[in-house]
Amino acid sequence: MDVNPTLLFLKVPAQNAISTTFPYTGDPPYSHGTGTGYTMDTVNRTHQYSEKGRWTTNTETGAPQLNPIDGPLPEDNEPSGYAQTDCVLEVMAFLEESHPGIFENSCIETMEVVQQTRVDKLTQGRQTYDWTLNRNQPAATALANTIEVFRSNGLTANESGRLIDFLKDVMESMNKEEMGITTHFQRKRRVRDNMTKKMITQRTMGKKKQRLNKRSYLIRALTLNTMTKDAERGKLKRRAIATPGMQIRGFVYFVETLARSICEKLEQSGLPVGGNEKKAKLANVVRKMMTNSQDTELSFTITGDNTKWNENQNPRMFLAMITYMTRNQPEWFRNVLSIAPIMFSNKMARLGKGYMFESKSMKLRTQIPAEMLASIDLKYFNDSTRKKIEKIRPLLIEGTASLSPGMMMGMFNMLSTVLGVSILNLGQKRYTKTTYWWDGLQSSDDFALIVNAPNHEGIQAGVDRFYRTCKLLGINMSKKKSYINRTGTFEFTSFFYRYGFVANFSMELPSFGVSGINESADMSIGVTVIKNNMINNDLGPATAQMALQLFIKDYRYTYRCHRGDTQIQTRRSFEIKKLWEQTRSKAGLLVSDGGPNLYNIRNLHIPEVCLKWELMDEDYQGRLCNPLNPFVSHKEIESMNNAVMMPAHGPAKNMEYDAVATTHSWIPKRNRSILNTSQRGVLGDEQMYQRCCNLFEKFFPSSSYRRPVGISSMVEAMVSRARIDARIDFESGRIKKEEFTEIMKICSTIEELRRQK
């Protein structure tokens, strides 16, 4: 039977149908090949927006730099980055006037954080540019490599374990005449195998020492590596994103800590809160504007879009903001915070992998690395690429492009939000000094502007004034992409507001389904997603029940665990049928062992093992949850685990789900193919870290684990902890005198070895 799709909408209010227009079903688009072209686009565009600025040359690296600050006053409609310093300082002053003490208090909070943060803060995050190897690595490995190189070059402040001391080393490293680094490489040799007499390729791993002079080191320290942003829906073209190295990250973290603390105190800021809390905050602003515009005033809302937000922002502006916000603070604190924007003013963008050429006739492929783009003959490229390369050539140094203006995506989300909110703050009547006034919401580059005025002319005048004020701060509201509506209907950060927020359910679609971690986690995550959507996203009981049935079906097909009494034949059905027949209480079998599904929408919060525990045969319980069973995962399981959910919009979210350790919570083994690559050295490092961290956790179980405040190394902390525990155990009679003496002896030996080292 054919269904006319319009029939689906007869009973649905128009605003609820918005979900169906979102491009969120099916797989998102991924990028293939190199991001070099996208990165060149970003660099060229950024320079174009600031082209009337002043050119200077960096004395240390020789990089040409463009400074658009206080440049010509911007033209209408053309995006530009000519922010005016005095205007920025003035909006900051007004922001402080409306929120007395806001900067002062945030600085005090941040200073406390700065003094307590440990270096391991930098291990969070995924791919990071590792300057020692000149490519991306997991954050923990990149940090370890940096610290290792620092220590071998005599920089040891980081040994205290405090982030601020690591940053002292970073500053110190920039003054050094040269830095020695160790790089991993691999040699391939063709040799004849003795047994089979065939030729095989032998790989050997090597490490070689290399010295970087001051200029080369600075270039690497200031480099942001670029990649293509993956899985962006609803866009035709891909775009480049940046990942900074370890030298920059710590400084950025402290600036963002200050900015976050300020954003928390600003009612117009959509960051750092999320979800329902964010919706409540937004609803408050809308309510305020609507109640104040009862009969006499008109109220309109702009769903705003800014043109190329990051590419027109400028690190020099951020420096001015920080200088103002910290003006009464201690010198050391002001210095620490000003380093991030200074580094960004001197940043270099790494152009990625370069271009791949292939000749159809000769079946040849060759890679042109980014380093060669400065000198290669351009006749090999097509027109558009040739133009890009010609434009970027004057900026190239050692395969990286000098990129002084502009910020890269996602680096200073909080700080740029403060800048946006400071303009919204100017909309109060005491500042506009006329009949129109405005307020709104800002979340990084996304904004909604609510303008109230007695008549349409007033609304128009208010919007114009807002638009021009933005221009003075290097913010370019797009007249083409922003639209205005009577207040009550607008969109902000993919929340649709129509007299209240409408659930945009399509955004959650990608997280329904089987995650593919393991049988235990997948079951738990699947039902938690349904539960969360009933709470947060208007998922009604009937739909939830259907979602649950579809999920169970999907789960059974994924893991081939159809019910024991089914006719479906799979690879597992033989074993599952056998288990089914010898089980007395069949309701107690887990779904993944061919049991029935006992979930309904009322008990989604209970882990399946707990739900069925009373129904299980005793020997089944013993096999399923016996810690001596070699198939039960031996990690000490916390009661809560975290899954990373990829919603359709915004960053990956952490989602908590109940974790019960059973034979089904297996952890898949690492793919073997990495063992044959130059990453092998890295794997060794990773395993060593893993062992150290596991050992540390044994000494400080999470129940009693307070971060060691004060300055001690991991070893010192563990030794002192071992002594305390041993004494307590000895005095309470849990261990004998001989054992106690032996423990004390081992502790002394460890300390002695450390001293000799």
UniProtKB/Swiss-Prot annotation:
Name the Enzyme Commission number(s) assigned to this protein. 2.7.7.48
The listed location of motif Nuclear localization signal is 187-195, 203-216
What keywords would UniProt list here? Eukaryotic host gene expression shutoff by virus, Eukaryotic host transcription shutoff by virus, Host cytoplasm, Host gene expression shutoff by virus, Host nucleus, Host-virus interaction, Inhibition of host RNA polymerase II by virus, Nucleotide-binding, Nucleotidyltransferase, Phosphoprotein, RNA-directed RNA polymerase, Transferase, Viral RNA replication, Viral transcription
Catalyzes what? RNA(n) + a ribonucleoside 5'-triphosphate = RNA(n+1) + diphosphate
- Specify residue ranges for compositional bias: Polar residues: 55-64
Annotated region Disordered: the residues are 53-82
Statement: the UniProt record of this protein carries the keyword Glycoprotein: no
Q: A Gene Ontology CC term for this entry?
A: host cell nucleus
Residue span, RdRp catalytic domain = 286-483
**Any GO BP annotation:** symbiont-mediated suppression of host gene expression
Q: What Pfam family does this protein match (any one)?
A: Flu_PB1
Gene Ontology molecular function: nucleotide binding; RNA binding; RNA-directed RNA polymerase activity
InterPro entries in UniProt: RNA-dir_pol_NSvirus, RNA_pol_PB1_influenza
Subcellular location per UniProt equals: Host nucleus; Host cytoplasm
- Keyword Transferase present in the record's keywords: the answer is yes
EC class, as a word, reads transferase
**Modification(s) after translation:** Phosphorylated by host PRKCA.
Renumbered residue ranges of the record's region Promoter-binding site: 249-256
Subunit-level organization:
Influenza RNA polymerase is composed of three subunits: PB1, PB2 and PA. Interacts (via N-terminus) with PA (via C-terminus). Interacts (via C-terminus) with PB2 (via N-terminus); this interaction is essential for transcription initiation.
Function summary? RNA-dependent RNA polymerase which is responsible for replication and transcription of virus RNA segments. The transcription of viral mRNAs occurs by a unique mechanism called cap-snatching. 5' methylated caps of cellular mRNAs are cleaved after 10-13 nucleotides by PA. In turn, these short capped RNAs are used as primers by PB1 for transcription of viral mRNAs. During virus replication, PB1 initiates RNA synthesis and copy vRNA into complementary RNA (cRNA) which in turn serves as a template for the production of more vRNAs.
The record's family statement is: Belongs to the influenza viruses polymerase PB1 family.
Specify the protein name: RNA-directed RNA polymerase catalytic subunit
Q: Which organism is it from?
A: Influenza A virus (strain A/X-31 H3N2)
